[in-house]
Each structure stands twice: as C-alpha cells, then as structure tokens.
Amino acid sequence: MVCIVSAYYKIPSKKPHEWYLPYLVRWFRAAASNTVPTHFFTTEDVRQELASLTDISRVQFHILPFEELTAAELGREFWELQYARDPERYHSPETGMVWYEKRHFVRRAIEMEPDINVFIWCDAGCIRNDACEEVAKKLGQRFVQYEAGRMYFQCIQEPAQKQFYQYPDECIAAGLFAGDRAAWKDFIALYEATLFEYTIAGFSATKEQNVMASCVFKKPNLFVLWTQEGKVDRTWFKFLELL
C-alpha cells in the first residue's frame, strides 16, 4: 500500500500566498478523486481557508504550528545563515525550513501508518494545469515495483560527480519523491548528515535539490534516478503521472 504526504504553510516564499491558492485547490480536487491514503500538515487557518474553497474531506489533516517543526529545533540563526549564503535571494529562511521539513513530515506519517510501506512526498503546489490535475487523481496507483530500500528521485540531468551543489546546478526535481519505509529512514539520516556538511563547508543548505544531489553522490545505491520524461509534465513534476 502507498501513502501520499504533503504540507503547506503561509510563509515568505518565492510567490505570495494568493499565487499558490489555485494550485492548492487543484491539489485537493485531485486528492478528492484519489483513493490513496493522504496526510497533509498545515495550520488551522490554512485548513479553514481550503475548506471554504474546495472539498478537503478525504485528506487527513494534521495541525502543526510552524514553530513546532523539526526545522525550528535547529534555531533561527541556523536558517538565517543558510539564507545569507544563498545566491538565490528569493529563498527565505522559512522556505528553507519547509523544504528541509519534507522528510520529517513523511517521518511523522510513517509513524502514523504502520501498515503502509511506500510513501510519496508530493508538493502541495505542484498541480499547475488541467492535465496535471487529471493524472494526479491516480498518483500512487500506477507504479508498484519499488525496489526495496531505495528512494526514487526525478532526475533533471545526471548530477556531476562532486560533493557540493549550488546555483545554477539543476540535477534533482524535489517536488515529488518516493520510497519504502527503510529507504526513507536511510535517506533522512543521510540528508541530516549532508545538511551539516554543507554548513561546515560554508555552502548554503537552503535548497533541498542541492542537498539531495549530494546525497546521491555520497550513497548512489540508495537512489533510483528516474530520467524518463512525462507527457503532461516533462521535468519538475513528472512523477504525477509516472507513480
């Protein structure tokens, strides 16, 4: 069995909250037509706003204040440092915190779902058009031959063989990724260690795509890099129609 996990927080981000709302509505419309168990982490005000816009009844909500995220345990100064080192200035410290937290949202869902083996992270803002919305209705129902103990990443281009990645490197698309319980456990531990290696080396760890690429460099056998293109979305969100 498969589980979908996502989250959304109203924070300083690349785009204003109003820009994301239509895509959030699309996400929940697709979820309403899906049969895969789905967990969503957010705040109560966001839940109420979404409930006023679309049907959210099939999704299991978890109200988790932003200040209670695992990312907050690293301290505000840690995320301010990542932002200060980040050449892409539209990434706020809060954005870095949510990107980091994706793995811990999944960790929480894993703890809640002892009978489910495969977990898919799916960004709440990744459904941008009608075609993506349609294929997302079957997310988690197509691909069943997950290799035990391996994470599945969307590969934009084969990562160069190096320890650290920074702008303009683009190797891994982080809107959707998946794996079984064992793979997630190993990936979370590897990501944590790699995050601090970035910090010690003087690189920004804000952008999860870069840290994920470094994880692939360090432990390639943990990952399946999916290069196949989608028909609806060819790159960043192709797992919407492939998983």
Where are these regions (language model features)?
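N-proximal low-complexity "stem/linker" segments adjacent to membrane-targeting elements
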Residues: 1-23
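Short, acidic, metal-binding catalytic loop of nucleotide-sugar glycosyltransferases
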Residues: 21-37, 52-56
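Short internal beta-strands
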Residues: 39-43
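Short, charged/polar "capping" segments at the starts of alpha-helices
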Residues: 44-51, 161
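Active-site-proximal specificity loops/subdomain of glycosyltransferases
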Residues: 55-113
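GT-A fold catalytic core of metal-dependent nucleotide-sugar glycosyltransferases
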Residues: 100-152
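Catalytic core and acceptor-binding pocket of nucleotide-sugar-dependent glycosyltransferases
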Residues: 128-131, 166-243
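Short beta-strand-to-loop element that shapes/binds the nucleotide-sugar donor at the catalytic cleft/hinge
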Residues: 149-164
